[in-house]
Amino acid sequence: MDQSLVPADSIWTWKQADGCSLEVAWQCHADTPEQGQNSSVPAVVLVHGFGASGNHWRHNLPVLGKRTRTYALDLIGFGGSSQPQALLAGEQPALGQADRSQSLVYSFDLWGQQVADFCKAVVQGPVVLVGNSIGGVVALRAAQLLEDHCKGVVLIDCAQRLMDDKQLATQPAWMAWIRPLLKALVSQRWLSTALFRNAARPRVIRSVLKQAYPSGNNIDDQLVELLYKPTQRPGAAEAFRGFINLFNDHLAPDLLDNLQQPVDLIWGQKDPWEPVSEAQEWEQRFSCVRSLKILTNAGHCPHDESPEVVNNELITILKKY
């Protein structure tokens, strides 16, 4: 396949070990023939954050694609990929939905395996994984699964996942009291759906973006639409339900502690949700972390808020391979 001509809505059928299949939407930019699958330059695979899609890399794909094959895929439950019904611990599939293509447990193992299998089946060569927010946790898990096929990871404002049970010691004491009630409530589909429908409105999306993008750069109608449109698909609320019920899953520090590949960090100093102090601690704590670039005027999604700066930093990192 000439991947320089791959349309934005390409679909890869992800065949599971149990025989079930899920559809994964993906796109690729590769401007020159020498960037084919036999190139010695690692390809780049971009992994989006919660509620986003591969389109969130709109300002990065074309630029990075001039250097090497660059891919962006939609995680299961998001964008144009399959959106199976979310199963929580102890739940059974509804009648007629035993097939994993219709109902499954959303998890970082699921998404990490998706990215790893995509790299092996579609990219077919060495890769560097770049992840934003929860996409960073996914990238770390995928790097573990890929082993030598993954040459390195770049984390952009990686998610801390403070609501995980393992983070309880870092939370206020009152959180331990209300936590059982909170977990019981958000497990209810009627409530998670109501919360999702409230959040999945253009006005609310724009309001959240103003927090995530403190400079206001690139908050435009295109951005709001690319985030809003996938929320109108029939199964969109299910990924939301699955994610907000992830109370015992992988944390980035645990993955970093067991990672063999080099990791570079890019962080917005004004991120309202993932403090830069955590990135600074990671730089000192984990031997796999080789660099930290702090962007003074950026927030949670600097790759879209300050794409020129992030693209230059990514190109500098890629030159190390």
Sequence positions of predicted segments:
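Catalytic active-site module of serine/aspartate enzymes centered on a nucleophile-bearing elbow/loop
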Residues: C288-Y321
